[in-house]
Amino acid sequence: MDYAIYTEGLTKSYGAVRAVDSVNLRVCRGEIYGFLGLNGAGKTTTIRTLLGMIHPTAGRVEVLGQTVTRNGRGPWRQVGHLVEAPAVYPELTVREHLEMARRLHNLSDPKATARVIDQLGLAIYADRKAGTLSMGNLQRLGLARALLHEPALLILDEPANGLDPAGVVEIRELLQRLAHERGVTIFMSSHILTEVDRLATRIGIIHQGRLIEELEAKQVETLRTRRLEIQTRDLTTARSILTNAAYGSVITQGASLTLSDPRAVEAPDEIARLLVNAGAPPTHLAVVQENLEEHFLQLIGAV
């Protein structure tokens, strides 16, 4: 298998604290990998080790087939990154920042700067000083620098940070185009679970430094179990009636009953009729579906 990112037993400790604990990542070329976790779970520390910004306590890191070493060697000409807030010179304009980055990358094409300005919607801010930009436009500038040299791999820490809803959609569509049209591999951390759900082809969940679950996009779809949520003034009677009617497991959650039996989910009117006839009419009846956010919260709560 040809991996864009490969780690084996990746561990980073600060004293007695293991920020990253034996993480094994396998990110295939061309995929969009969403890296989820609470604040302090180890996302940014993992990303910094992938980029050679910090050295792991133990384990091995390979990026685009090259081992990331202490001497700074790696495939960095083929990697674009944005980690936390982009560093800028307040007195330089957007265009000057990108021109400086173009020279540092030794890019001979003078149109590269104009290309990323257009890609990131920065045309009207191109000659504005970075110190006057909003947080969202600073994030766009950071993404423009990451894309300037047309990398094969993008490593992004919270790429939607500071963007308004329209900006989030723009960046999502840009990343999708890069992956689908150019085969760019994208490894991104985010706390916006809905965006990861829409964008990622595979999702990894890190908690307390450990990679506790990985999901393919198809698995994310299948985990969304539909269920029927019922509220009534007489939960005891309702529960007894539904159990006797062989509707499978009847789960009590606070002031509600839930049924996962497909017969109940597909025909809630039958459940309503049954409860009305039994003298326990429902005051609330709705088909609900678990999403990635609920699954994530249940998972980390169970660890």
Q: Where on the chain are the PLM-derived regions?
A:
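C-terminal coupling/interaction segments
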Residues: 263-303
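Alpha-helix N-cap/helix-start and coil->helix boundary motif
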Residues: 11, 95, 119, 193, ...
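ABC transporter nucleotide-binding domains
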Residues: 2-7, 12-207, 211-213
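Residues at or immediately flanking beta-strands
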Residues: 60, 227, 281-284
